[in-house]
């Protein structure tokens, strides 16, 4: 896995200049990069997968359509002394999918939740929430993003990864001191 700093730099560059960037073209010239939580080594885990009977599920999306994922197991860890269980899914392509909401959702982070890419290493899964990211829907309408199912709504805060994306309107209001933050 590339370093966190390299990952963030590459992502910011893609969002500002990439032809596939979800940020509207008219906002890219003023895009100064995403806001992130500081790196937190306590939010990195290497955990075994507790397999569950595989089941295909329909996920709601931000556009109202449905997407199919397969539930493959549960991952357990602790955050601030609180036990947490999160469900891991698999897309039709075979890639793992870990969508979640947490106690920061709708406050410091995107309200609909974030995603985390995970890798399997020697039978365990590496979860590094410092790499948690917003779905494209956080940046612009017109995308159909799977919403985290209720079983992945965590009660603990995951203060790691990407924070809320602020559009130009929000940034202008902040500059004028009109924000409630």
Language-model region placement:
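N-terminal domain-onset segments
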Residues: 1-55, 176-181
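Surface-exposed peri-terminal alpha-helical interaction modules
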Residues: 17, 30-31, 45, 51-52, ...
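Extracellular/lumen-exposed scaffold segments
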Residues: 26-29, 54-71, 87, 124, ...
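A generic structural signal for short beta-strands and their flanking turns/coil linkers
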Residues: 41, 71-73, 82, 94-96, ...
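A structural detector for beta-sheet-dominated domains
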Residues: 46-48, 78-80, 89, 101, ...
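Mid-length scaffold segments of soluble, non-membrane domains
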Residues: 59-111
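Acidic, glycine-rich flexible loop segments
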Residues: 102-133
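Extended, aromatic/histidine-rich regions of cofactor-dependent oxidoreductases associated
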Residues: 133-181
